[in-house]
């Protein structure tokens, strides 16, 4: 399964009562495909997975699958700190028709490396879907080291990793150890080009809600050998990449989408709405990049 090079970690739209707005979720998924996304992660960190119920996640999986059809891959965020619960939700995601699974490293209980291995191995054995591992020690509290990732490559359906440790040394080692068909994705927009330069495959992006086509151009320039053009686009987009993370994600990207007239609602506690300074910062970014609600949308 080829997930694509630009995958958007989609926000979960809520209505004024902070209920999931499935109509707007379908609309947003279509918008993302029309603005350059090859794939969509549903109910990941950016989708506020910790505050979504199991039933909400399953319905979101089906909603996005139905919305995008075969125009993009749909990857379900089903990982948790409970192996059996992860397997159960992953099976439901398969029934919903998703193309793959995003499995975050178990958080809070901080397993040793053998625990990470056995957790991911159990899911890979139980659910015959392509799996993207997700390493984000800044959120989980523990790092999945490259040697553990290499062990997990023995499972044919573990096909990729979203690497968000923020370490180019770690990415370089994972790429060095990877089997030929194993894909390494950046988990940070600002590190997309550096990770591509050492053999990474793509990005699981937040900024692609706003500048998907420009990110696609940067990726294409890099893989086609036009490094100077890729670097130019990277430099141009860098303030946006960083600006969307001046507070906890997805607070800012939701604020930006709302300002652009593409309503996605607020965030669920314990996250809080963007404050006045953060809203002002998003407004300034929108104006400086000349963004509007279409975000350069092209209807297929």
UniProtKB/Swiss-Prot annotation:
One of its GO terms (molecular function) is 4-hydroxy-tetrahydrodipicolinate synthase activity. It is found in: Cytoplasm. It is an enzyme of class 4 (lyase). Disulfide bonds: none annotated. The keyword Ribosomal protein does not apply. Its EC number is 4.3.3.7. The active site is at 134 (proton donor/acceptor), 162 (schiff-base intermediate with substrate). It catalyses: L-aspartate 4-semialdehyde + pyruvate = (2S,4S)-4-hydroxy-2,3,4,5-tetrahydrodipicolinate + H2O + H(+). Pathway: Amino-acid biosynthesis; L-lysine biosynthesis via DAP pathway; (S)-tetrahydrodipicolinate from L-aspartate: step 3/4. It holds the Pfam family DHDPS. It comes from the Bacteria. One of its GO terms (biological process) is diaminopimelate biosynthetic process. Pyruvate binds at residues 46, 204. One of its GO terms (cellular component) is cytosol. Keywords: Amino-acid biosynthesis, Cytoplasm, Diaminopimelate biosynthesis, Lyase, Lysine biosynthesis, Schiff base. Belongs to the DapA family. Catalyzes the condensation of (S)-aspartate-beta-semialdehyde [(S)-ASA] and pyruvate to 4-hydroxy-tetrahydrodipicolinate (HTPA). This is 4-hydroxy-tetrahydrodipicolinate synthase. It comes from Heliobacterium modesticaldum (strain ATCC 51547 / Ice1). The lineage of its organism: Bacteria, Bacillati, Bacillota, Clostridia, Eubacteriales. The gene is dapA.
């Amino acid at each position: 399964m080829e997930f694509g090079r630009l995958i958007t970690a989609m926000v979960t739209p809520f209505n004024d009562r902070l209920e999931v707005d499935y109509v707007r979720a379908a609309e947003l998924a279509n918008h993302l495909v029309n603005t350059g996304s090859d794939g969509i992660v549903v109910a990941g960190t950016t989708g506020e997975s910790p505050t979504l119920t199991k039933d909400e996640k399953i319905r979101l999986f089906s909603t996005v699958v139905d919305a995008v059809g075969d125009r993009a891959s749909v990857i379900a965020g089903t990982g948790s700190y409970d192996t059996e619960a992860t397997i159960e939700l992953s099976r439901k995601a398969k029934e919903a028709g998703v193309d793959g699974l995003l499995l975050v490293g178990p958080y809070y209980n901080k397993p040793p490396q053998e625990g990470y291995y056995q957790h991911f191995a159990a899911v890979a054995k139980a659910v015959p879907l392509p799996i993207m591992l997700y390493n984000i020690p800044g959120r989980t509290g523990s790092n999945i080291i490259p040697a553990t990732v290499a062990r997990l490559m023995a499972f044919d359906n573990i096909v990729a990793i979203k690497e968000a440790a923020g370490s180019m040394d770690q990415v370089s080692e994972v790429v060095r150890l990877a089997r030929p068909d194993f894909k390494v994705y950046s988990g940070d927009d600002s590190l997309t080009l550096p990770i591509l330069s050492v053999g990474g495959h793509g990005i699981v992006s937040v900024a692609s809600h706003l500048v998907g086509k420009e990110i696609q151009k940067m990726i294409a320039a890099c893989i086609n050998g036009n490094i100077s053009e890729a670097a130019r686009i990277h430099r141009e987009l860098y303030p946006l990449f960083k600006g969307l993370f001046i507070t906890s994600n997805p607070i800012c990207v939701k604020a930006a989408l709302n300002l652009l007239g593409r309503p996605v609602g607020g965030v669920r506690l314990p996250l809080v709405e963007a404050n006045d300074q953060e809203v002002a910062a998003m407004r300034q970014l929108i104006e400086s990049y000349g963004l509007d609600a279409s975000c350069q949308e092209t209807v297929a």
